[in-house]
């Protein structure tokens, strides 16, 4: 990334949005991208674009499974989750959202033209509504349903 390019200013705007909205995840992400842009960007950014989402999903999955691994959630708790309507609803919604995210990944890889709008929407959601950046996958999944594709 060239210093003071349009890309620089867009990222700077996102960093400022992160600071204004007190969303450190967004601000730290932009700072990391600034640093990466000075260290062989032609080598690093293609790798980040290809593998960072998979790495993030891996880390998120580890975080979700950690209570089971630590024993805070045991087999009995898992079994009991099938005995309460709220838990069953949670299971069904979890299945639906996972399926939706899969559709989103497919749409984003087959129609990259939609990625920009999804990213801008996600960043605005993170900056102003205290959202988390899992939005592009779910948003792309919803978009795929709306478009009737994938």
Curated annotation (Swiss-Prot):
Bilayer topology annotation: Multi-pass membrane protein
Keywords: Cell membrane, Membrane, Transmembrane, Transmembrane helix
InterPro entries: UPF0756_TM
Keyword Membrane set for record: yes
Main location, first listed in the record: membrane
Residue intervals passing through the bilayer: 1-21, 28-48, 51-71, 88-108, 123-143
Record has Membrane as a keyword: yes
A Pfam family of this chain: DUF441
GO cellular component, one term: plasma membrane
Domain of life from the UniProt record: Bacteria
Record's subcellular location: Cell membrane
Name the record gives this protein: UPF0756 membrane protein HDEF_0364
Species assigned in the record: Hamiltonella defensa subsp. Acyrthosiphon pisum (strain 5AT)
